[in-house]
Amino acid sequence: MSNPIKIGIGGPVGAGKTQLIEKVVKRLAKEMSIGVITNDIYTKEDEKILVNTGVLPEDRIIGVETGGCPHTAIREDASMNFAAIDELLERNDDIELIFIESGGDNLAATFSPELVDFSIYIIDVAQGEKIPRKGGQGMIKSDFFIINKTDLAPYVGASLDQMAKDTEVFRGNRPFAFTNLKTDEGLEKVIEWIEHDVLLKGLT
C-alpha cells in the first residue's frame, strides 16, 4: 500500500473548493495516480459533482458525511477521513496524491497536521473585500491561499489591490493567488505551487 501525499482544501460554502479540485485533478491526473475525499454535512453532493465531471473514475472518489460541525471531521476527530483514506488505498493501491475537501466552514477551520501534509484555503471575492483583513486561521495557516471569483470584484465593490495588501499583512511571504476558476485564470500559479512545493518537481 502506498503512502500518498495529502492536500487539504478548505474554505466557506460556495468559494470554489470542488471546482478547484476538478480543475487541478484534470491537469495532474495525466501524470500521476490521484484520489479525492469530499466532506459534506448530511449529503454526498460534492462527491456526486466530481463523479459527474468524469475527472476521475468513481472508485477514486469517496464522500464522507460528517454530520454536525464539518471542521471537527478534519481536525479534532478525523477518524472518518482516515477510514476514507484507507478505503481509497484498498481500492487503488497505486494512489500517489489525495485531495481532501472539507465541508464548507468558517474562516477559523484548519486541517489536522496528522490528516494532511499540505493545505489550501480558498475564499471568494463576493464574500467581501474585508475577508482577508479578518485574518482567520484557515487563511493564515494554510500553505497556499486563494482568492477566487475575481471577475465579481466590480459588482461587489471589492478592490483586489486592497485584498492583496491585507493578505500580505497576515501571510507575509507565504504564497497566494487570485483566480477565476470559471475561466482558469490564475490556475497555473496553483498548479506550479503543487508541482514545485508539494511534488518537488525539478529537484534532483
Swiss-Prot record:
Keywords: Chaperone, Cytoplasm, GTP-binding, Nickel insertion, Nucleotide-binding
Name of the gene: ureG
Family: Belongs to the SIMIBI class G3E GTPase family. UreG subfamily.
Role summary: Facilitates the functional incorporation of the urease nickel metallocenter. This process requires GTP hydrolysis, probably effectuated by UreG.
Annotated GTP binding sites: 11-18
Location(s) in or outside the cell: Cytoplasm
Primary location class: cytoplasm
Name of this protein: Urease accessory protein UreG
SUPFAM superfamilies found in the cross-reference section: P-loop containing nucleoside triphosphate hydrolases
GO annotation (BP), single: urea catabolic process
Domain of life: Bacteria
Molecular-function annotations in GO: GTP binding; GTPase activity; nickel cation binding
InterPro entries: CobW/HypB/UreG_nucleotide-bd (IPR003495), P-loop_NTPase (IPR027417), UreG (IPR004400)
